[in-house]
A protein has these predicted regions:
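Assembly/oligomerization scaffold segments
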Residues: 1-116
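Solvent-exposed coil/turn segments that connect beta secondary-structure elements
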Residues: 14, 47-49, 77-79, 89-96, ...
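Surface-exposed, non-catalytic interaction/assembly patches
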Residues: 19, 117-126, 174, 178, ...
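Well-ordered beta-strand positions in beta-sheet-rich domains
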Residues: 28, 41, 84-89, 106, ...
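An acidic/polar, Gly/Ser/Thr-rich interaction patch typically located in mid-to-C-terminal regions
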Residues: 37-65, 223-375
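Amphipathic, non-transmembrane alpha-helical segments in extracytoplasmic/periplasmic proteins
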Residues: 43-44, 109, 119-150, 166-191, ...
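Sec-dependent N-terminal signal peptides of Gram-negative outer-membrane/periplasmic proteins
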Residues: 55-60, 96, 117-120, 147-150, ...
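Short beta-strand-centered interaction patches in the first periplasmic/extracellular domains
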Residues: 104-107, 111, 151-225
Length: 375
C-alpha cells in the first residue's frame, strides 16, 4: 500500500494488534457500511500456507469451537488520521484452494450487533420502564465489550403503569431493540470507535444535519476526485403519510398530513417532486397522539428521498475516507444535482496498492439549498 495509508488489524476476545505475519497475509478487505438500522459487515481474505497454525486458529475460532468470541477490529490510518472501519465478530470462515502450498482463508463477519442475536431472554419483564430505559438496560450487558450507549428518548417515551401493563422482552436483544426503535420511528445501529475496542450503540432518530464531508467533484478535469458518479430522479419514491387521531367524544377519525421535514431532517433539495403520493396510515387511529405522530414521522423519513446517486472513488485521490450516515457535498454534476447529500451506503474495498470506495447518496429534491459546499 502507499506509504500514507496503513491498515490496522486487531483480533481476539479482547482485540489486540495482530502479529506482523498475519497482517502481511491479508490480500483483500471488504467492509460494508449502511444507513438506517442496517448492520455493517466485513470480509477479510488471507493467503496462508496450508500448514500454517494461523489457518487452524481461524477455522477453530470462526466456527465457535473453544473460542466464544472471535472479535475483529479494522482501522485505517490515512495521512496521520486513524479511523475504525469495523468492530465486530467473525461469523463464518471459508477455505479456498490455492497454488504452491498457499490456501486462502476468507473470514466473514458483522458488527457487534450480531452478538446480540446469540442469546434470547424471552419473558424478561421491564416494569414501569419506558422504551429508552429498556434499551439502556439491555445495552448495559455489553459494556464489557466497549459498547457505549447513545440513547435519545422519543416524545412517546412514557413509562407504562404496572397495574395496567408490564412490558416483557420477546426474542433476542437485537430484535427487541429494533422493534422498540421501529415503534417510534427510530433507528438502531452500532458504529465503531472512537478508540479501538469501543463501539457506539445509537438508538434515536436518523440525523441528517452536521458538518458535511469534503465535496465529491466530477466533470472538473484535474479537480475531479471521483472515478464515476451517476444520478437518478425518481418522483414516485416520495410519499406523504396521513395519520389519524380519534376524537374522544364522537370517536371520529381526524386525518392529519405529516411532512417529511424535521429539525433533524431538513430539506437538502429546494424543489421536491409535487404532488407527492398520499399514503393513509389507518392503523394509527388507535394510538395516542405522540405515538401516531412518531409513526407518521418514521414513514415520512423512509419515503422522503427522490434524488439518488451512486459512484466510486479512489481514497488516495479523495484524500480521506468517505463515511456513511453523514452529509457530503457534490459539485460539477450540474445545477439540478449539485449540493448536499446524505450518504446511505459505503463499501470499502482494500487491496495491496489500492483503496476504492463505492457509495450511494440520497436527498429529497432537485437543486441545492446551499450556495456552496466545502471542498
Amino acid at each position: 500500500m502507499a506509504s500514507a495509508l496503513h491498515l490496522g488489524l486487531y483480533i481476539g476476545p479482547v482485540p489486540i494488534a495482530a502479529p506482523a505475519e498475519l497482517v502481511h497475509a491479508v490480500s483483500k478487505v471488504k467492509v460494508d457500511e449502511g444507513s438506517g438500522s442496517s448492520q455493517s459487515g466485513f470480509e477479510i481474505t488471507l493467503d496462508l500456507p496450508q500448514r500454517s497454525p494461523l489457518r487452524t486458529i481461524f477455522l477453530v475460532s470462526g466456527g465457535g469451537g473453544g473460542v466464544p468470541l472471535m472479535r475483529v477490529t479494522l482501522t485505517v490510518t490515512l495521512n496521520g488520521r486513524t479511523e475504525s472501519l469495523i468492530d465486530g465478530m467473525a461469523t463464518n470462515v471459508e477455505t479456498l484452494p490455492g497454488e504452491g502450498g498457499v490456501a486462502q482463508i476468507v473470514v466473514k463477519g458483522k458488527d457487534l450487533s450480531a452478538l446480540m442475536r446469540v442469546i434470547e431472554l424471552p419473558g424478561l419483564p421491564f416494569p414501569a420502564l419506558p422504551p429508552s430505559v429498556r434499551v439502556l438496560t439491555i445495552l448495559a450487558k455489553y459494556a464489557a465489550l466497549g459498547v457505549i450507549p447513545m440513547v435519545i428518548p422519543s416524545i412517546a417515551d412514557v413509562p407504562p403503569l404496572p397495574i395496567q401493563r408490564i412490558p416483557v422482552q420477546r426474542g433476542n436483544d437485537y430484535d427487541y431493540i429494533q422493534r422498540l426503535a421501529a415503534d417510534v420511528g427510530y433507528v438502531f445501529y452500532l458504529e465503531p470507535g472512537p478508540a479501538v475496542g469501543t463501539s457506539k450503540a445509537y438508538w434515536g432518530p436518523e440525523i441528517r444535519v452536521g458538518a458535511p464531508q469534503p465535496a465529491l467533484t466530477t466533470n472538473m478535469d484535474g479537480a475531479s476526485n471521483v472515478e464515476s458518479l451517476n444520478f437518478n430522479f425518481d418522483r414516485e419514491r416520495k410519499k406523504m403519510p396521513i395519520v389519524f387521531f380519534q376524537e374522544s367524544a364522537s370517536k371520529a377519525p381526524i386525518p392529519v398530513p405529516i411532512p417529511d421535514i424535521t429539525p433533524l431532517n431538513p430539506p437538502l433539495g429546494a424543489i421536491p417532486p409535487l404532488p407527492p403520493k398520499i399514503e393513509q396510515l389507518a392503523d394509527t387511529a388507535h394510538l395516542s397522539a405522540p405515538e401516531a405522530l412518531m409513526k407518521g414521522f418514521a414513514f415520512a423519513a423512509l419515503h422522503s428521498d427522490s434524488v439518488f446517486g451512486n459512484g466510486q472513488l479512489d481514497v488516495m485521490r479523495y484524500g480521506r475516507l468517505l463515511r456513511s450516515r453523514r452529509l457530503v457535498g457534490v459539485r460539477g454534476a450540474g445545477l439540478p444535482f449539485d449540493g448536499l447529500y446524505y450518504v446511505q451506503t459505503v463499501t470499502h474495498q482494500i487491496e495491496r496498492g489500492a483503496y476504492k470506495q463505492s457509495f450511494s447518496l440520497a436527498r429529497n429534491g432537485l437543486i441545492s439549498t446551499v450556495p456552496q459546499v466545502p471542498v
